[in-house]
């Protein structure tokens, strides 16, 4: 039987247990002493800001190190193209799934809420920002930073990714003459990852602050009005993860449950903070540790954070149909097709916009005249709770995408990956922040199909 001393010792070594404890204490604090709990918000916000502070640098280091040592630049372009095609297929499946589930269940039907009962002021906060969602040309132009420094200063990950790909490609082409620069960036990455390791140790505190504030602010009762929407959303995400992503992962030779267990610490942090940004560096590190080549991880994960938002895609079509039903708006087949086509465009602008879920939901509703935009206010009270499901599904989707594309490219050491997922090889033992050396990532350089 485990003694208290043994449990404390185990907790001191396990970020996962520390995060669970932080989450439980946060709920207790939020319910028991809400006045104090609402003041804990800076702990969660501060933790996420600390993580975001290093994301651009980590993406730069991982991508440059990966591409500069990748050898064949045609392979890098091939990975990028395959990633975009994969993302488009999977997000389309997610959008269709959300649409079909909401429509077939009649989600929200019978509520009989009249438009004049809805407070327009809250809606205006989000509809007034729909101009932030750009068209395809403006989006592509937005990938090009005004300067290298502005990309890093504004923490625009896609702009940083573009510069990193160009910089890494140039290092690759210059070759031996630039070996000193490549070595310097590699050594710099050790420092950045060490800082990240220090920050990750604060995860339990960040989760405690975020959960305590949310429980005190919204309360468990806030789910009661829109419980059906929340439950159907989570059930749909679960079906998508286990059936769709599970099948994709299985085709790559990996089982979903061991895969989820491998990322349990990161999933717990996302559950507490409702932000997948908070674990991006750790996830990239763990995927490399599984045996995936760093250049593949560095290209797929940052791109996926903007183009492969499976959880958000489910939420978008589910919420649009729910609002239509709850306001008594009849939907013809042409309306459903319009919702799907509009969502395919608007869903690609979600990452990087504050309050992006509600802003893009407003943009989608605005583009579908049959549905009243005022219905947006109906999902405001449960948006945070649904945000947890969005972030979890987005994260799992991007991890699965990385494994799948690495498998297509023979960029994964499968014996090593299976050994780690089966528990025969240990996962990174602690958040020490050390980047993984190439030999540790790819089985001394030998990759297996």
UniProtKB/Swiss-Prot annotation:
Keyword annotations: Cell inner membrane, Cell membrane, Membrane, Symport, Transmembrane, Transmembrane helix, Transport
Keyword Aminoacyl-tRNA synthetase attached: no
Coiled coil ranges: none
Subcellular location(s) per record: Cell inner membrane
Residues passing through the membrane, by range: 14-34, 47-67, 83-103, 157-177, 195-215, 226-246, 312-332, 359-379, 385-405
InterPro entries in the cross-refs: C4_dicarb_transport (IPR023954), Na-dicarboxylate_symporter (IPR001991), Na-dicarboxylate_symporter_CS (IPR018107), Na:dicarbo_symporter_sf (IPR036458)
Principal location listed in the UniProt entry: membrane
GO cellular component: plasma membrane
Origin superkingdom: Bacteria
GO MF annotation terms: fumarate transmembrane transporter activity; malate:proton symporter activity; succinate transmembrane transporter activity
Record GO biological process: L-aspartate transmembrane transport
Pfam families in alphabetical order: SDF
Record HAMAP family: C4_dicarb_transport
Family: Belongs to the dicarboxylate/amino acid:cation symporter (DAACS) (TC 2.A.23) family.
Protein name: C4-dicarboxylate transport protein 1
Organismal lineage: Bacteria, Pseudomonadati, Pseudomonadota, Gammaproteobacteria, Pseudomonadales
Gene this chain is encoded by: dctA1
């Amino acid at each position: 039987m485990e003694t208290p001393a043994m449990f404390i010792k185990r907790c001191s070594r396990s970020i996962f247990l520390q995060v669970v404890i932080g989450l439980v204490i946060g709920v207790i604090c939020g319910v028991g002493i809400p006045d104090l709990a609402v003041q804990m918000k800076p702990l969660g916000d501060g933790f996420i800001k600390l993580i975001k502070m290093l994301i651009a640098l980590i993406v730069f280091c991982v991508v440059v190190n990966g591409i500069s040592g990748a050898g064949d630049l045609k392979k890098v372009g091939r990975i990028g193209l395959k990633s975009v095609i994969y993302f488009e297929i999977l997000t389309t499946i997610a959008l269709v799934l959300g649409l079909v589930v909401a429509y077939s269940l009649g989600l929200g039907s019978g509520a009989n809420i009249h438009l004049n009962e809805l407070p327009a002021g809250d809606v205006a906060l989000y509809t007034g920002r729909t101009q932030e969602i750009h068209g395809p040309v403006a989006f592509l132009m937005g990938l090009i930073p005004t300067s290298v420094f502005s990309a890093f200063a504004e923490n625009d990950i896609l702009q940083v990714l573009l510069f990193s790909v160009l910089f890494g490609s140039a290092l690759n082409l210059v070759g031996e003459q630039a070996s000193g620069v490549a070595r310097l960036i590699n050594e710099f990455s050790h420092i950045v990852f060490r800082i990240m390791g220090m920050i990750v140790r604060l995860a339990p505190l960040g989760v405690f602050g975020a959960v305590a504030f949310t429980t005190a602010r919204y309360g468990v009762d806030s789910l009661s009005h829109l419980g059906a929407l929340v439950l159907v959303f989570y059930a749909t995400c679960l079906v998508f993860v286990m059936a769709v992503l599970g099948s994709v992962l299985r085709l790559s030779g990996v089982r979903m449950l061991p895969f989820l267990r491998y990322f349990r610490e990161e999933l717990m942090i996302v559950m507490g903070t409702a932000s997948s940004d908070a674990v991006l560096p750790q996830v990239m590190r763990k995927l490399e540790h599984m045996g995936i080549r760093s250049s593949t991880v560095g290209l797929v994960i940052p791109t996926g954070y903007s183009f492969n938002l499976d959880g958000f895609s489910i939420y978008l079509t589910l919420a649009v149909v729910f609002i239509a039903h709850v306001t008594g708006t009849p939907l013809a087949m042409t309306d459903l097709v319009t919702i799907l086509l509009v969502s395919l465009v608007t869903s690609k602008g979600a990452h990087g916009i504050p309050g992006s879920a509600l802003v893009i939901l407003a943009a989608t509703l605005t583009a579908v005249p049959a549905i009243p935009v005022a219905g947006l206010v109906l999902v405001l009270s449960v948006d945070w709770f649904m945000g947890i499901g969005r972030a979890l599904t987005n994260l799992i989707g991007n991890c699965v995408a990385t494994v799948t594309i690495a498998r297509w490219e023979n960029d994964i050491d499968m014996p090593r990956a299976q050994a780690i997922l089966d528990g025969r090889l240990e996962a990174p033992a602690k958040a020490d922040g050390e980047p993984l050396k190439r030999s540790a990532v790819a089985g001394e350089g030998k990759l297996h199909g």
